Amino acid sequence: MSDNITRSTALVTALENVTTLSPTTTQAINDTNITVPHKCLLLLYEDIGKSRVRYWDLLLLVPNVLFFMFLLWKLPSARAKIRVTSSPIFTTFYILVFVVALVGIARAVVSMTVSASDAATVADKILWEITRFFLLAIELSVVILGLAFGHLESKSSVKRVLAITAVLSLAYSVTQGTLEILYPDAHLSAEDFNIYGHGGRHFWLASSCFFFLVYSFVVILPKTPLKDRISLPSRKSFYVYAGILAVLNLVQGLGSALLCVDIIEGLCCVDATTFLYFSFFAPLIYVAFLKGFFGSEPKILFSYKCQVDEPEDVDVHLPHAYAVAKKEGMDSGFYSSTQIDTTAYLDDVALYALSCGQHQQHRQ
């Protein structure tokens, strides 16, 4: 009898212990089964301390602020160079780079100040799309203007190119924004805040592959038979620019493909490419195409003109895009020296103005 009582007591105690431990055990199991946000997803929405400022927004804000301050510092000399040359292409690029830096700053600041409400999320995504619109417009403009430099003769032709790129960029951004707002990607949601997903994994993959093919084709153009039929930019920086964007889109496409097959590590790839693109694309444009133009020292004051009256839509003397050397005796290598060869262009303008001034003095 005593043994039975002892066994019964032990059984009751064991059951009580199981009952007591069951909620804790269940909670631990539930915590394990809950999808813990990946560190690359956590980076996109985690706040700094108790503030509403996210690490991601701060990472994107700092480079844009620094670059904008640099543009302001260079503004006086840049305006002087633009007034001297009256080049619509360089003026347009400079304005677009300025706008991209401003929009990037505005997007980050607004995202830092809004709450996690649905309206704030939509506003944040719209700002992302506006930024993407300007970046893509510059992308397309650089490619088209770079490849068609030898065929652009007036301001009106440059305006037509910009209009076409604006329409294409708008169509892309509207499509991406519609997918992003109406059909958000569930894989890019965290807590009560839906992360900007660039139109979703599948749209991201398709667009990345498309742009990778475009930029890869631009890079290999000088190796194709087309080099004998069309004038190609020979400035190395043009192809370096295209190569960088090709690699960027390749990595972004691989990351998107991993996300499409539910491999969350792909998010780390697209995080890196997104940060590089939205933070350093505008500086890349400046270094590749505008640095030489604004940084070259003028050889002479450009205040002498041989002609006083000019028509309203005067031909623009654009820097020539020379064909890649392919004949005997033209030992210029694979990429030589002029895509948008701004230094040589300014030298030509200076020599032309100097010769005109000397001619007038001789006549007097």
Swiss-Prot record:
InterPro entries xref list: TPRA1/CAND2/CAND8 (IPR018781)
Compartments where located: Membrane
Example of a GO biological process term: G protein-coupled receptor signaling pathway
Keywords: Glycoprotein, Membrane, Transmembrane, Transmembrane helix
Pfam families: Tmemb_40
Membrane topology, from the record: Multi-pass membrane protein
Keyword field contains Ribonucleoprotein: no
Sequence intervals crossing the membrane: 58-78, 86-106, 133-153, 161-181, 202-222, 244-264, 275-295
GO annotation, cellular component aspect: plasma membrane
Gene Ontology molecular functions: G protein-coupled receptor activity
Keyword presence, Glycoprotein: yes
Glycosylation sites: 4, 17, 30, 33
Assigned protein family: Belongs to the UPF0359 family.
Name of the protein in its database record: Transmembrane protein adipocyte-associated 1 homolog
Organism: Gallus gallus (Chicken)
Lineage: Eukaryota, Metazoa, Chordata, Craniata, Vertebrata
The encoding gene: TPRA1
